[in-house]
Amino acid sequence: MSKKLLSTVFSLSLVAFTSGTVLSSAALADEAADIAKGTEIAEEWDRRDWGFGDTESYMEMQLENRHGDKSIREMRQKTLEVPGHDVGDKSLTIFDKPRDVKGTAFLSFAKIFDPDDQWMYLPAVKRVKRISSKNKSGPFLGSEFAYEDLSAQELKKYTYKWLRDEPCGELQCAVVEQTPTYENSGYTKMITWYDLSEYRQQKIDYYDRKGKLLKTLVSSDFKQHLDKYWRPYNMYMENHQTGKKTRLVFSKIEFQKGLKDSELTKNTLKRVR
Amino acid sequence: MSNFMDRLSVSYAKGIIRWRWLVLLVTILATLGVASGGRFLSFTSDYRVFFGDDNPQLNAFESLQDIYTKTDNILFVLKPNNGKIFTPQWLEVVQDLTEESWQIPYSIRVDSITNFQHTEAVEDDLTVADLVEETGGLSQAGLDRIEQIALSEPALAKRIISEDSTTTGVQITLQLPPDDAIALDEAVKFAENMAATIEATNPELEVAITGLAPLSNAFPAASMADMSTLTPLMFLVIIIFLIAFLRSFTGTLGTLLVTIFSTMVAMGAAGYAGIKMTPPSAMAPTIILTIAIADCVHILVTMFHEMRHGKAKRDAIVESLRVNMQPVFLTSLTTVIGFLSLNFSEAPPFHDLGNIAAIGVIAAWIISIAFLPAFIAVMPVRVKPVETGKSSMMERLGEFVIGHRTKLLLGMGLIVVGTSSFISRIELDDRFIEYFDTTVPFRVDSDFTRDNLTGVYQVEFSINAEESGGVSSPVYLAHLEDFANWLRAKPEVVHVNSITDILKRLNKSMHGDDDSWYKLPDERDLAAQYLLLYEMSLPYGLDLNSQINIDKSASRMTVTLDNVSSNDMRDIALESSQWLQDNAPGYMGADGSGAAVMFAHLADRNIKSMLSGTALAFVLISLSLVFALRSLKLGLISLIPNMVPAIMAFGVWGLFVGQVGLAVSVIAATSLGLIVDATVHFLSKYNRARTERGESSADAVRYGFRTVGSALWITTAVLVAGFAILSLSTFAVNADMGLLTAITIAIALFIDFLLLPPLLMLFDREKATATSTAPAAPAE
């Protein structure tokens, strides 16, 4: 009698135990599936941008404070794709406006985990300075964009987790949580909306070091180049905490103009126009 | 006319007694109904509430804050018990604190010696990095180097690091939602917990917290402290007074209920009106408690007097209401006028105080002529048949005054003139840190900061350049530099933060850290490119917008002052504007602003705005006296005892204290409404004796002393005690106001007893006519 009772208790607890394990492992499996799905989406996004070669873009940066005061800067950016997942792209930014910084050029070799290599050419002193700085999370040109928002988005910079699918405007989007893997990021996480038709980043919410929503980037006016590469011609970043806004408007983006690696060196920086 | 009013009062009193239960029920229900608005009461936590929407200093400061990064801040101040801060141990604490400060809710920027962006040139490399990176492996040479850099950096020395290297600060800039007490409290509490944790793990380190956010947060704390300690204390004092003077349980209980109901009604109405409590308006409950007593005391004293002389309770109630209806109404009216005149004040918290107190006074009047007699009618009342010594003492005082009227007139005249002459010694000073007394942690920490690190008062300038990008112009920068140097030469100036220091440092770094290049770049393009370079190299949370506006057409200069008086602050702000006007291009003209400047102007502006309010209150109150007493002559005589006490109180203050701030501006108006009460009671009795009884002025004075003398003692004692309790407030504006009002009321009684009667006997000598047509249109 007591034996029977014992065994019943035992088998009952066994059932309880295994079902508990099954439950938690199911949750784990879900989590793993979400991570896999998120990573897949990001990989697809990354894959669709492979082989763009090089671009040259003309942009206007419009800064606005919470009071509504505005300021405009103009610049060009040449970007050279560096193949492989472990290194970032190289880019050269040349400032055209305001007039007193015209001709100032900024060369950056993006790194994934280390600080970027950066050089700046100041035409007023005709000197090139290498800048050593941990400014990845710092503001780009006093705007609401940080370097890390603008520099080429390498796949390995983040871990991904799919959250849900939901409509975004007229499209259907996958919502993916991205967590920076590199040091000195200004963010604890980003929530990115990828549209499921072309895997473009339609919208990104950035969360600050306190885990509070810091800013939102909305990209629009997407145009396709070479029948493959999509680029937004309008990027609008709004800082929810300070009320400051920055809009990047591209007037022209040209692909595969034959930019060579040798054109993007410290020594050629002086000669750029 | 007078008989008609008496008859009306008598039938009113009889009605109250007849419908006593209904009256009790209705007053209680009405009170509870209004009091339920109390649930909407909340405390404001924004120091800006002291400034009206059209305050020019507030607007200047707001527009400055629109252009640059906000200035709401928390400053941690760290000081080891002994030795310098430049040790691996302390630098690590500072570094950790800098890092953790990003977790403070609403923080948008953190500045400290460790994350200061130091630029350094090595050949063609420009390193822009945290001044302190790794604390673990720092050698003595490394520590010395960091110390030397920090102390020679104008942006840090005497702002973030003390000259003797023993104290350092970690500055957190906050972006708070406007006037959100919960958000503010959250941020400040978070910082306080961090400070407590650091002190717990590092017992030999002292950590203080100051800044505009803790300042703002200290206001609701002060309001709540006043309401939770002073109001109960006032209750206690009231109970003691009532028991001592009335010697009647029912009378004491009835009075207490009247005062409580009045306060509940006022606070409930404030809740419905959506008023947010500030330290000044938090005085309202205590003030209402105090004032509500006066009405009851007058009604009860007369009633008990009648009962002692053999009248039945209900007859005594009727007689008391007949005699007191008019003076009680009149004193309430004058008090309401006095408080309502606070709406002329520059500082909105005083509007709230005035309006809440006015509602409370009106409620007290209604409740004491309706609820109180009904309550007395249903409760048992016993009085000792024997008269106490009080009255005969008052009669002796009356005889003394009548006997020595000429000497008193001269003596009192001399005292009035003599005391008033000390008004010139009053100095206006509104240092907002000193609004809080030394029991308030914010004050202690701010004093600690001032003694060890840097000043706590700042004057800010937004200085325009000629055009967009113009901050890089050599002309602009040169004048900015001259201005900064001129300011730094002033003994009151502790620190000046200017973009010229950044540009000089960059120029030096771009020239291989050669000290001879520590000067302003002499070309506009060069300066602009330096700024661009610097802007491009800043890390998370740091940007130039704290000092330069977005299109680079203006820059901010922040001047930190030592513990100077608000007069000196105003002077420095004015001299600075003048300097810019005289020495810089016209477009660079700027006025100083900031919290310190706003408070520095507040008392001055408030006095000016209250002048008209006080004058109007004075005219209205005097007119109501003339009308009520139906005598222009008595009205004119009453001007003296109504005006003199406040003037003398200022003189007494000038003699013994000297400094006063915001409080001074509202005293005359609010105390006027209160001190008039004693005059009204005395004059109305005097007038009754002259007109009803046809007595001579000396006999009428005797009658006045006999009938209201002791009631005036009691009410004055209660009022003085009530306002004296306010002087215990930790908030200086309240404490000053309480003490000044207490002094004024005490002086008023002194004047009413010793100066008013001789004046009456001097100017009101002609034989009175016993008819009711007293001089309505006097011949004089």
Regions found by a protein language model. Give the residues of each.
Chain A
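N-terminal mature ectodomain segment of secretory-pathway/periplasmic proteins
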Residues: 33, 37-124
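Gly/Pro-enriched, hydrophobic low-complexity segments
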Residues: 107-109, 117-121, 127-131, 136-153, ...
